[in-house]
Design a protein with these regions (language model features):
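Binuclear metal-dependent hydrolase catalytic cores
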Residues: 1-98, 178, 183-204
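Short beta->alpha connector loops
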Residues: 81-84, 105-109
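Cap/insert and terminal regions of metallo-dependent hydrolase folds
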Residues: 89-90, 96-101, 107-201
């Protein structure tokens, strides 16, 4: 699709969404005096450091790098493997109150514990193939793109994370897996607090 720009970044995505909703936005601009969204947003595509990364080498060995910093927060990132997707990032937020690291969508990777070293909270995606009956091609894609829950605990342990929170939980079975089972799987190799995340949940640093 869109052969002239098949791999749009955040700037292109945002501009295309703005164009797609132009009619509605124009109505509200003229009829209600709302602010022009283009004047209240600043979009930045993340520039990947020169580490040999490409669509053929999506997550090479690298150090975390700063993507944003002000007097309240420092945000660092690292490339992670997410199947054919490039770039895919994990992010870490450091503040005076503590640190939180988000794995983002990622297959099992040593990049996450490198970024998340000694973080207060590691928020990590998780999937389970227990009882999976779908197409083999989809299973292959998912295994290359996501992390099985049974390995998330060892990632948290390697990072020395203070707490592990499961998110983006992919239950690939026909019969839903109970929350306690996700918790038990995630605790394998990790002896600290584990939380199975849910909608609208709040976790204090």
């Amino acid at each position: 699709m869109n052969p002239t720009n098949p791999t749009p970044g955040i700037t292109d995505l945002t501009n295309s969404c703005t164009d797609a909703f132009a009619y509605s936005t124009n109505v509200f601009l003229r009829d209600t005096g709302m602010r022009d969204p283009r004047r209240i947003t600043t979009i930045h595509d993340i520039v990947v450091p020169e580490v040999g990364a490409s669509y053929q080498n999506t997550a090479p060995d690298m150090a975390p790098f700063v993507v944003m910093q002000d007097d309240k927060v420092k945000v660092t990132a690292i490339l992670v493997p997410h199947g054919p997707v490039f770039p895919a990032f994990a992010y870490r937020f450091d503040t005076a109150y503590g640190s939180v690291t988000f794995s983002g969508d990622t297959a099992y990777s040593t990049a996450v514990p490198r970024l998340a070293a000694n973080t207060d909270i590691l928020v990590h995606e998780a999937e389970s193939f227990e009882g999976y009956q779908g197409p083999p091609a989809l299973a292959d894609h998912l295994r290359k793109s996501h992390t099985e829950v049974q390995r998330v605990g060892e990632i948290a342990h390697a990072a020395n994370a203070g707490q592990l929170v499961l998110t983006h939980i992919a239950d690939l079975t026909h019969n839903p897996i109970p929350v306690p089972q996700w918790w038990r799987w995630a605790r394998q190799g990790y002896g600290r607090r584990v939380t199975v995340g849910g909608d609208l949940q709040r976790i204090t640093v």
